[in-house]
């Protein structure tokens, strides 16, 4: 409601499990108008062999990983690699900034109950395969008894949602003002 001009597409809104590939395809199939932007935010819970692992973190694609984000059919082949490299660098910077804003939002909401594990880079399937700025959020560990209780609490989940929302709002405001 706060962003009536923004489209929000949920890959799921009930207890179903689309494959990671389905989620990526759904995101990549969104048609943008001129001057429209798109972000991909994937929300997960973590697991570990250690029951002591705890905390929230936000992941982005490492800058050294290169993907094709510009469709070869849409630009002359002479400039494709240059344009693709420029877009990929822009997407990487936006992903890092979005990750930090979301992490800050989560830290403000849940940082007293769960450790902040920071922003991190890795080639997770969803951030590697979407053609847009993207992050993967891990809200806590289902292998940790304390965090299971938190993640089953509606109040805690509302705080997680508010933290993500506040982080995205800060990112969007900064992005639109610059």
Write out the residue ranges for each language-model feature.
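Active-site-proximal helix/loop segments of hydrolytic enzymes
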Residues: 1-178
């Amino acid at each position: 409601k706060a962003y009536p001009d923004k489209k929000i597409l949920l890959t799921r809104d009930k207890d179903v499990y689309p494959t990671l590939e389905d989620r990526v395809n759904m995101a990549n199939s969104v048609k943008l108008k001129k001057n429209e932007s798109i972000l991909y935010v994937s929300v997960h819970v973590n697991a570990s062999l250690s029951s002591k692992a705890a905390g929230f973190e936000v992941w982005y694609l490492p800058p050294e990983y290169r993907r094709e984000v510009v469709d070869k059919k849409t630009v002359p082949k002479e400039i494709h690699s240059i344009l693709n490299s420029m877009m990929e660098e822009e997407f990487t910077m936006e992903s890092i900034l979005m990750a930090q804003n979301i992490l800050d939002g989560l830290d403000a909401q849940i940082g007293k109950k769960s450790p902040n594990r920071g922003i991190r880079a890795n080639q997770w399937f969803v951030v590697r395969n979407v053609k847009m700025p993207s992050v993967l959020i891990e809200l806590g560990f289902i292998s940790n008894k304390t965090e299971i209780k938190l993640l089953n609490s509606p109040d805690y989940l509302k705080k997680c949602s508010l933290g993500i929302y506040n982080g995205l709002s800060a990112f969007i405001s900064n992005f639109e003002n610059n």
